[in-house]
């Protein structure tokens, strides 16, 4: 299918961006309390868009693995953002099959909590392993990446 590269890239993008985003959102919350209302609104908007994807139609159109791992990562991210925002962000996922695995990913993030590049890479690797995505990513040095490559 022509969508396969797009689905693959979206999962890899989510996997490699969420762990650093968690650290960044926590840092903003702690270091810039004046931005909390803006941050809360932005994360709530992000959650509303993500929750809209829980529809049966989208689930049917998307390869199972892609859909499931994406939802599990969403649950983890929004669970970790609840203390940041003071909002109940995981509510739409309560009756979904993604809650337990999402909670496990969130626990990995809490146990590893580091705010440096090595921590980001370690958490990405842990999430990839937990989600069965280790073979979907390959780490390269910057000088090994072709110009114009997104990931």
Spans of features found by a protein language model:
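Post-HEXXH active-site segment of zinc metalloproteases
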Residues: 1-18
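A residue-identity detector for tryptophan
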Residues: 7, 13, 27, 127, ...
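An active-site-proximal "capping" alpha-helix that borders the catalytic cofactor pocket
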Residues: 14-32
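Pan-zinc metallopeptidase signature
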Residues: 33-151
């Amino acid at each position: 299918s022509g969508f396969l590269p797009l689905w693959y890239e979206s999962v890899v993008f989510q996997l490699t961006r969420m762990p650093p985003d968690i650290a960044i959102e926590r840092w903003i919350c702690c270091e810039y309390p004046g931005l909390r209302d803006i941050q809360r609104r932005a994360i709530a908007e992000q959650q509303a868009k993500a929750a809209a994807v829980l529809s049966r139609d989208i689930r049917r159109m998307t390869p199972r693995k892609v859909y499931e791992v994406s939802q599990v990562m969403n649950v983890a991210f929004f669970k970790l953002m609840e203390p940041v925002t003071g909002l109940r962000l995981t509510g739409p996922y309560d009756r979904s099959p993604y809650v337990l695995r999402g909670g496990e990913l969130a626990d990995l993030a809490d146990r590893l909590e580091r705010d440096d590049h090595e921590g980001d890479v370690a958490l990405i690797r842990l999430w990839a392993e937990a989600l069965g995505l280790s073979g979907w990513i390959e780490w390269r040095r910057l000088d090994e990446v072709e110009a114009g490559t997104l990931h």
